[in-house]
UniProtKB/Swiss-Prot annotation:
Annotated protein name in UniProt: Calcium homeostasis modulator protein 1
Species of origin: Homo sapiens
Cytoplasmic side: 1-21, 73-99, 207-346
Segments in the Extracellular topological domain: 38-49, 126-180
Keywords from the named record: Calcium, Calcium channel, Calcium transport, Cell membrane, Disulfide bond, Endoplasmic reticulum, Glycoprotein, Ion channel, Ion transport, Lipoprotein, Membrane, Palmitate, Sensory transduction, Taste, Transmembrane, Transmembrane helix, Transport
Gene Ontology biological-process entries: ATP export; ATP transport; monoatomic cation transport; protein heterooligomerization; protein homooligomerization; regulation of monoatomic ion transmembrane transport; sensory perception of bitter taste; sensory perception of sweet taste
Membrane topology: Multi-pass membrane protein
Tissue: Predominantly expressed in adult brain. Detected also in retinoic acid-differentiated SH-SY5Y cells. Specifically expressed in circumvallate taste bud cells.
Gene behind this protein: CALHM1
Stretch list, region Central pore: 10-37
Disulfide bonds: C42-C127, C44-C161
Length: 346
């Protein structure tokens, strides 16, 4: 069983786009299930029906949209790219727009499903517009002019509540309910049709007219995603090597002090030969992973430099040395060994 879960997890990791599409589909199904389980209670009061219905129609989609953005890991990447200092790498607004649109398209699926299900069900629309039913056309129009406007609004506001509705002498409740639900379902199917056409235009037609710009934005958004993953992986590898070498030096220095009978305070004066690891090949490999960054201050300057002044997107050319918060290691940079395969989830 664990092997199956491991295989599924590895598949999802290697297919980030399919994984995000699956998450969006699950959220869409969850939004429909949430609406079916939701207990809709119209207040049946003239001043509150519209506000209650608007809250039911708009608030849950907003929450679902924000949840869709939160569950997308690219939100932090987009914010980081948007707010980073310019440095030696220009920021392309087209790439930022592409990244945001890619996330927004997936995050909008669940809100669209909620709005469509709400309109097709008709309860929310019935509660919101029950006071706008044309009594003269659907009910006893001869009695309507004799009623004061507040009294007429009070009677019509109770149409969604069959247990308290007392205006059958003016307008049959079933007639008003069927009339409003018919309009609501027509709006619901129109909304589904419009969103489907809009999605078709965005996904299929737009790249045909702006193919070059679309390909550029897509490529560089994927590059930003992969660059961030590689940097995080390199930092993780460096942190592991740094911790391993630091712990080895501590244990070997402690062993040296115990052999000499020194106290705890002499750890800092242990000879450098005592800190040499017992396995030279393994130690050399760990030293190579450190890439010349062997102290906390240098690492902090490197991270600050990466944030403030990312390297230009120019390969095969000699880069000018970074000043201040740049490369602090002596001599040339050690060779890098980076062999990895990533699938972008943008």
């Amino acid at each position: 069983m664990m092997d199956k879960f491991r295989m599924i997890f590895q598949f999802l990791q290697s297919n980030q786009e399919s994984f995000m599409n699956g998450i969006c589909g699950i959220m869409a199904l969850a939004s429909a299930q949430m609406y079916s389980a939701f207990d809709f209670n119209c207040p049946c009061l003239p001043g509150y029906n519209a506000a209650y219905s608007a809250g039911i129609l708009l608030a849950p989609p907003l929450v679902l949209f924000l949840l869709g953005l939160v569950m997308n890991n690219n939100v932090s990447m987009l914010a980081e790219e948007w707010k980073r200092p310019l440095g030696r790498r220009a920021k392309d607004p087209a790439v930022l727009r592409y990244m945001f649109c890619s996330m927004a398209q997936r995050a909008l699926i669940a809100p669209v499903v909620w709005v469509a299900v709400t309109l097709l069900d008709g309860k929310c629309f019935l509660c919101a517009f029950c006071t706008a039913v044309p009594v003269s056309a659907l009910g006893n129009g001869s009695l309507a002019p004799g009623l004061p406007a507040p009294e007429l609004a009070r009677l019509l506001a109770r149409v969604p509540c069959p247990e308290i509705y007392d205006g059958d002498w003016l307008l049959a409740r079933e007639v008003a309910v069927r009339y409003l639900r018919c309009i609501s379902q027509a709006l619901g199917w129109s909304f589904v049709l419009l969103t489907t056409l809009l999605a078709f235009v965005v996904r299929s037609v737009r790249p045909c007219f702006t193919q070059a710009a679309f390909l550029k934005s897509k490529y560089w958004s994927h590059y930003i995603d992969i660059e961030r993953k590689l940097f995080d992986e390199t930092c993780t590898e460096h942190a592991k090597a740094f911790a391993k070498v630091c712990i080895q030096q501590f244990f070997e220095a402690m062993n040296h002090d115990l052999e000499l009978g020194h106290t705890h305070g002499t750890l800092a004066t242990a000879p450098a030969s005592a800190a040499a690891p017992t396995t030279p090949d393994g130690a050399e490999e760990e030293r190579e992973k450190l890439r010349g960054i062997t102290d906390q201050g240098t690492m902090n300057r490197l991270l600050t430099s990466w944030h403030k002044c990312k390297p230009p997107l120019r390969l095969g050319q000699e880069e000018p040395p970074l000043m201040g918060n740049g490369w602090a290691g002596g001599g040339p940079r050690p060779p890098r060994k980076e062999v990895a395969t990533y699938f972008s989830k943008v």
